[in-house]
Amino acid sequence: MTTVTTLRTAHTADLTPTELAAARALMDLAFDGDFSDEDWDHGLGGVHALVHDAEGELLAHGSVVQRRVLHNGRSLRVGYVEAVATRPDRQRQGLGGQVMGALEDVVERAYDLGVLSPSEEGEKLYRAHGWQTWTGLVGTLGPQGVTEMPDEDAPMIWGADLDPAHALLIDWRDGDVF
């Protein structure tokens, strides 16, 4: 049985309060309540990819927001992928792949590279889309200057061939930096 779905991309500013509430509720459902308001805030202000069924119910979501990384003396514009989730009863049906394809199109057209912090459950999807685990050092450039983060889980990158001999320093933010 094939289910008809529609994929839509839209900036946060173009989503209705009802659409945003549905996406937020999907995060709570998919992450079993382990998706904080801070996590949600990180996914706002960029482009969202939303997959709906024929009745208009939201099945999958992801967003890409702009951030900056310093690498090897350059400041790079990053499409940072956030809030990727599929309704639990619809996982493993290609919906996450639709979301990632749409977000990767945005990254390819608007950014120097894509970066994300994978969940254990999502890593297989990202690898299938060509995302690679960063093997170099990571850190942040924040209010206190450069802070190395040797215990940080490695992010994944897409669309750029960066030298892991040089640290990947991402802009600081509240909550999880990566």
Task: Name these PLM-found stretches.
Residues A22, A102, E121:
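Short Gly/charged-rich anion-binding patches and loops
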Residues V81-Q91, E121:
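A short, internal acetyl-CoA/4′-phosphopantetheine-binding micro-motif in the GNAT/acyltransferase core
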Residues D89-A102:
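Conserved acetyl-CoA pyrophosphate-binding loop and the N-cap/start of the following alpha-helix
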